[in-house]
């Protein structure tokens, strides 16, 4: 009786192992595709502070392997210039925000690149951290006008990388309004 079931069972196990091996050695992994090949693409547009938006995208792309910010397409992160009211972001989910960069903040001496990169951070799922420490991008204006750092620190970059790896759903992202205080 055991021999009657052993041969078909062994065949089924071998077939399952072959299928698993085929999936694990897909053409992408066999070709040694870089991790960025799996990055989630988020499109952005910038009618104001365009050069800063492009630089901010390069910064985030260099620090977050699971994210690829690209200008154009059906933009879900939209950046506009405004006068008055403070620089602010209105997140609408992970990889989605309407951002206003206040020219008065720039005129007051704040780095326009830091402001744009900070506000984009909200669209990527990060909250404000008004601790006044310049090495924290999300400390925003609390770090003062002398702070020129436009790069997320490793903690901030790792958090965005987790979010875009699918470790958390978009509903886990704070969708509050962020305005410079």
Kindly give the residue locations of the regions a language model identified.
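Secretory targeting and sorting signals
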Residues: 1-32
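Acidic/histidine-rich, surface-exposed loop or edge segments in extracytoplasmic proteins
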Residues: 35-46, 96-102, 140-141
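A short alpha-helix/helix-coil micro-patch that ends at or immediately precedes a cysteine
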Residues: 43-69
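Active-site recognition of the HExxH zinc-binding catalytic motif
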Residues: 60, 114-128
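Surface-exposed patches in mature extracellular/periplasmic domains of secreted proteins
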Residues: 64-74, 126-133, 171-175
């Amino acid at each position: 009786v055991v021999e009657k079931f052993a041969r078909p069972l062994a065949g089924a196990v071998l077939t399952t192992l072959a299928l698993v091996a085929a999936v694990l050695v897909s053409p992408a992994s066999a070709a040694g595709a870089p991790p960025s090949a799996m990055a989630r693409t988020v499109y952005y547009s910038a009618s104001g502070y365009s050069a800063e938006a492009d630089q901010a995208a390069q910064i985030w792309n260099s620090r977050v392997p699971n994210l690829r910010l690209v200008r154009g397409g059906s933009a879900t992160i939209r950046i506009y210039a405004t006068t008055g009211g403070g620089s602010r972001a209105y997140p609408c989910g992970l990889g989605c925000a309407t951002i206003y960069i206040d020219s008065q903040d720039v005129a007051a001496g704040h780095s326009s690149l830091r402001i744009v990169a900070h506000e984009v951070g909200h669209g990527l799922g990060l909250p404000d951290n008004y601790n006044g420490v310049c090495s924290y991008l999300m400390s925003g204006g609390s770090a003062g006008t002398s702070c020129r750092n436009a790069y997320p620190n490793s903690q901030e970059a790792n958090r965005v990388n987790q979010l875009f790896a699918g470790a958390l759903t978009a509903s886990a992202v704070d969708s509050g309004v962020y305005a410079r205080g």
